[in-house]
Every structure is written in structure tokens, then in C-alpha cells.
Amino acid sequence: MHKTITVFGSSQPVETDEQYKLAYQLGSLLAKNGFNVCTGGFFGIMEAISKGAVENGREAIGVTVDHWGGAANKFVTKEIKCNTLFERINKLIETGDGYVILQGGTGTLLELAAVWELSNKRLMDNKPIACHSSMWKEITSLMNEQMKLEGRDDGMVKSFNTVGEIISYLVTNTQ
């Protein structure tokens, strides 16, 4: 059984954007390392991840929400439809054996916070959580400082500068 990595990120990037290209590279490398991928199923980073995975022989699960309407991106090989945003977030988290958080906005922030809190409160199995982008590095650094002050585990969420570092971390920590 292949492990699945859930990737969170913006719906805004298009194929010519650096964020899209980085997400495509990540999806490709995840697939080449035997991982299926799971995303929110729509466009932008979600499409790029799915495209990279499918073009390299792996499954791309898309967890969509009826509220926004519209079809999943054409690279999704299995769609899971949810009725609400919170149902969708729960399904994205349940499906993942590890998580990657790429550039995004408030929705991506909500997803990161949900994964982090479930891990922090030991409400889910210990799974790797990897962030990419200077924005997340700043946020996770601030939160880790607070975690230290509270005497909590401050190493749950890791920040990385390259896709290669993320892949190495996931391969090592999803065994």
C-alpha cells in the first residue's frame, strides 16, 4: 500500500508562476518516491501537485467541497466530495500519512493550524508536517517560540527551503 501525502496550498497560481512550477516538481518527486498525493482538488497548487503525481504514475486524490461548485481539476484520479469546509479539512487530514504546506492564504493557514493542533494535542498519530516558503518559516518560528515558553513540543512542524529537503524528510519519517 502506497502512503499518501496531503499537500495544502493556494488555488491562485497558474502554470507560468514559480509557485505552480515548484508544486509540480514536488508532485513529481513525491510520485517518484512512491507517494500518492491528496489535495483540495481544485486549481493552482492543487492542480500542479496532482499533475506532477499523475504524470509519474501515482494517484491524485482531490477532496472538494460542494459549496464552491465547479469540477475537480482534470488530473484528479479519485474525487471525494464534502458538504462543508470543515468536513473537507478533516478528510484531507485523515487521508494524509504526512503533510506539506506550500504558499497560500487564509485557507492554507487554517489547514496548517488544524494539522498542527491535532498533532499538538495528540489527537492524531504522529505524522510529518513540512512547510515551504519564507512566510511559513516566519510563522512556524514564532509559534515554536510560544510552544517552548509553554513547555510543549516545539519541533512538530518543520520548515524547509527546497523540495529535495521536503522529500528526504517525508521519506525518512513515513516509514
Where are the regions that the model predicts?
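Glycine-rich beta-alpha loop segments
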Residues: M1-I61
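Short, acidic/small-residue loops that bind anionic groups at enzyme active sites
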Residues: T64-D66, L102, L118-L142, R152-G155
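Glycine-rich, charge-decorated loop segments at or immediately adjacent to ligand/cofactor-binding or catalytic sites
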Residues: G44-A48, W136-M147
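A charged, well-structured terminal subsegment
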Residues: G98, G151-Q175
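Short glycine-rich, flexible loops that bind phosphorylated cofactors or substrates
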Residues: V14, G107-L109
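Acidic/glycine-enriched connector segments
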Residues: G44-L102, G107
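Short Gly/Thr/Asp-enriched flexible loops that form oxyanion-binding sites at enzyme active sites
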Residues: E47-A53, L110-R122
